[in-house]
Amino acid sequence: MCGFSRRFDESYRAAYKKVENGLIGRPSVLRSQTCDKHDPSGFYVEYASWSGGVFVDMAVHDIDLTLWFFGSDIIPKSISAYGLTAVTPDLKKHNDFDNAVGIVEFWNGKIAYYYCSRMMAHGQEDVTEIIGTEGKLSVNLNPADNLVNYYHAGGITREVPATYWGRFEQAFVRETQEFVDACLDDTPLPMKLGNAVKAVQIGAWLQEALVSGKQLKFDETGRRVEASKI
């Protein structure tokens, strides 16, 4: 079992059930982001020295969602990525970025778009849209920490979670419960380890495309058309 917390989130599970029931037709495009609140302390610079890069560290959760909603058998056709250091230029010494966009085209006619950021001013903003041939689903499109809106002379204020933990706290609890159930009662796990490995592999390819500035291409078996450049 691997700790992809979004698979244990009630909203993502509800969205998956709707996809499974055919409510949006054939899922064709997935647009997903992991955006952290800006931390000016320099933590992310030190962290980048061993994290594997923004796509391996952050987008891996969005990639796992892609394998969940599109099917774990999907094969990349091309991978492109672009990034910048808008607020933390010291990340460059680790070949990392505080904002990055990645696009993965799959051989079965599906596309995934990922956005990662470490400079959100307001708080944690993790959003996903699954666009199908007959409809669309969104998860957390309007982030909120709770159901309270504060109405005042300047407008309406709604708080959002400050951290990843704040957004997925209950998912972490459920994940622990299901892991314990699997250990004690031999209940089925909600994912296979091979899917986790595949998510990390795609994340590593995105990071390679980001650092090299090159588009990566694959044949229909998933084999690289050309060798790695980094």
Task: Show the residue positions of the predicted features.
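Short arginine-rich
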Residues: 202-212
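Short, hydrophobic secondary-structure boundary micro-motifs
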Residues: 27, 79, 160, 190-192, ...
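Mobile, glycine-enriched helix-loop/loop "lid" segments at the mouths of ligand-binding/catalytic clefts
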Residues: 31-33, 136-157
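Predominantly a Rossmann-like dinucleotide-binding segment in NAD(P)-dependent oxidoreductases
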Residues: 1, 6-94, 213
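A generic short alpha-helical patch detector that favors 3-5-residue windows
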Residues: 167-171
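Contiguous beta-strand/loop segments that form the cofactor/metal-binding neighborhood of enzyme cores
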Residues: 64-145, 173-189, 204-206, 219-230
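Glycine-/small-residue-rich active-site loops that bind phosphorylated ligands and cofactors
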Residues: 7, 119, 198
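Glycine- and charged-residue-rich phosphate/anionic-cofactor binding loop of Rossmann-like
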Residues: 2, 160-164, 182-199
